[in-house]
């Protein structure tokens, strides 16, 4: 085999693996978050709106107005216009981005691994089943773009530093990749610490003074990008985190200690999803998730995993620098979405493990290279068989898993099968049933969700609103009352609550609740509340209605 073919063969192999795992999505619809973010979002349906996307939130205002991701929303706009709103182009872009990201991971790994180890890393990344939530979902384009940009940036940095030739054009290229990634999704902020981890592990030879001198221009550029990003984002959103915390964190008024304890309960599951996913789900919520109420023995395995990761990362730094860097990659990439620093809008989400999993496959590539170079022949054969089985199993699981993202009906049925004990699975399935007019199924699913976890005020508000629209005043009023007990300062749904009370003839309650709601309701509802108070006073005074 010529040298050119030897270089091309891994690229073709990896591209085919990535295609095999994603090509079946080409006929899928807009599913789950795709619908509010793309399909129902008029802001991404016209090219004339493109400039304004850089001053608007990612999620539409009616869905909370969270996030700031103008690059990916701009990309959605171009795709929508080009395909006249058809989903096939969005999924084609997903497929192409998935292939490009796999090749970028391989190219990045080649910067510090021989070709065989890098090929193993790229192949395992191509067939990793936990990636399906990203590759099968249109909104996963944000994760794909970030991983693509950051893998290229790390690979370029390591190559240029190894050659002792980090020039101005390299600084510009890496900074541009960072800026694009950061404007695509906020977790791209991990690039600077990732490069520092590379300096501490796979980049050898320079003393710390030399490193500071060489890296100063790059990190000054990073600082400028981050400050500019925070300034513009601050004009759009006031909250630094950018998203409302997960309902369990928010409505239970969970302390930081209990939030960390909850994540320690989740850490074994997260480690398994990254290293060897045996069970996948699009949602992880109570009671599938164990909520911490103070220190508990159940948190010890998660604590052990965290401590062991740090200890191994330090211990392997000299003996196995690539493995050490892989552990650092997992840690750094996962930290912003871990709920350990700040609460996020989820407890565990498979899409957030896409970029951290690069570190896991780098470790696997380092192990494969070590076995190829140092193990006995019998052990090498055994490892080759195990790798082949792992690739086949991963690809088969990935292809099978892609089916659940075909459309919303398929997705929500699969969600119930995957997370039968999760309250959000039943809540979301109830919402889907309501959209199709299946009211008996809707009520059954809503009641099941509330029995599992009644402290999600957003969910109980939604159910109360559904009851109101169906004319079921008594159960609606009961749920509104519960909702405002959980979230007493909420202004949403106050008028609907007062309306239900009026329908039930509870005029004393109408007057009390309308007056109590005045500090919380939006300005447009103040007049309605005052009218309700006046009507209650008239009825209670003996007037006819």
Report the location of each language-model feature.
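Extended amphipathic alpha-helical coiled-coil/heptad-repeat regions
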Residues: 530-532
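Conserved structural position within tetratricopeptide repeats
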Residues: 417, 448-451, 481-485, 519
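Short coil turns that delineate tetratricopeptide repeat
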Residues: 420, 454, 488, 522-523
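TPR/TPR-like (Sel1-like) alpha-helical repeat modules
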Residues: 499-502, 507-524
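Alpha-helical, heptad-rich or low-complexity scaffold/stalk segments
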Residues: 496-499, 528
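Polytopic membrane enzymes that build or remodel cell-surface glycoconjugates and lipids
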Residues: 1-458, 465-469, 473, 496, ...
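Alpha-helical linker/edge segments of TPR/alpha-solenoid repeat scaffolds
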Residues: 471, 503-512, 534-545
């Amino acid at each position: 085999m010529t040298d050119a073919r030897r270089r091309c063969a891994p690229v073709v192999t990896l591209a085919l693996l990535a295609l095999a795992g994603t090509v079946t999505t080409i006929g899928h619809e807009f599913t789950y978050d795709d619908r509010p973010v793309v399909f129902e979002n008029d802001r991404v349906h016209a090219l004339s709106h493109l400039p304004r996307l850089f001053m608007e939130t990612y999620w539409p205002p009616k869905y909370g107005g969270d996030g700031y991701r103008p690059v990916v929303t701009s990309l959605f706009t171009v795709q929508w216009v080009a395909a006249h709103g058809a989903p096939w182009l969005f999924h084609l872009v997903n497929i192409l981005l998935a292939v490009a990201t796999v090749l970028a991971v391989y190219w990045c790994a080649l910067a510090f691994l021989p070709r065989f180890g890098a090929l193993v890393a790229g192949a395992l990344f191509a067939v990793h089943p936990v990636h399906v939530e990203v590759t099968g979902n249109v909104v996963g384009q944000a994760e794909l773009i970030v991983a693509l940009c950051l893998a290229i940036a790390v690979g370029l940095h390591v190559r240029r530093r190894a050659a002792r030739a980090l020039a101005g054009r390299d600084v510009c290229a890496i900074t541009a990749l960072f800026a694009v990634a950061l404007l695509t999704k906020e977790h791209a902020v991990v690039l600077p610490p990732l490069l520092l981890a590379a300096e501490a592990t796979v980049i050898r030879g320079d003393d710390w003074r030399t490193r500071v001198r060489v890296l100063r221009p790059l990190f000054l550029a990073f600082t400028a990008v981050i400050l500019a990003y925070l300034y513009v984002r601050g004009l759009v959103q006031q909250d630094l985190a950018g998203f409302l915390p997960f309902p369990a964190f928010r409505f239970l008024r969970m302390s930081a200690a209990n939030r960390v304890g909850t994540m320690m309960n989740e850490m074994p599951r997260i480690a398994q999803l990254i290293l060897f996913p045996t069970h996948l789900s699009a949602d992880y919520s109570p009671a599938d998730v164990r909520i911490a109420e103070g220190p508990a023995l159940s948190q010890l395995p998660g604590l052990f995993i965290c401590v062991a990761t740090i200890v191994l990362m330090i211990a392997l730094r000299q003996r196995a620098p690539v493995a050490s860097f892989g552990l650092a990659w997992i840690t750094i990439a996962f930290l912003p979405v871990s709920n350990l620093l700040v609460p996020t809008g989820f407890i565990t989400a498979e899409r957030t493990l896409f970029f951290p999993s690069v570190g896991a496959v780098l470790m696997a590539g380092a192990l494969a290279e070590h076995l190829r170079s140092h193990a006995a022949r019998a052990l090498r054969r055994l490892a080759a068989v195990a790798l082949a089985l792992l690739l086949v199993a991963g690809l088969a699981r990935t292809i099978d898993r892609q089916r659940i993202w075909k459309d919303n009906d398929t997705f929500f049925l699969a969600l119930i099968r995957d997370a039968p004990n999760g309250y959000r699975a039943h809540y979301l399935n109830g919402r889907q049933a309501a959209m199709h007019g299946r009211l008996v199924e809707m009520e059954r699913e809503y009641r099941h969700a509330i029995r599992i976890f009644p402290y999600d005020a957003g969910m109980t508000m939604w159910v109360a609103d559904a009851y109101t629209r169906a004319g079921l005043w008594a159960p609606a009023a009961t749920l509104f009352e519960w909702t405002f007990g959980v979230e007493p300062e909420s202004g949403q749904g106050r008028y609907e609550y007062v309306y239900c009370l009026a329908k039930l003839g509870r005029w004393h309650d109408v007057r009390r609740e309308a007056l109590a709601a005045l500090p919380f309701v939006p300005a447009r509802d103040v007049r309605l509340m005052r009218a309700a108070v006046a009507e209650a006073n008239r009825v209670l005074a003996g007037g006819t209605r």
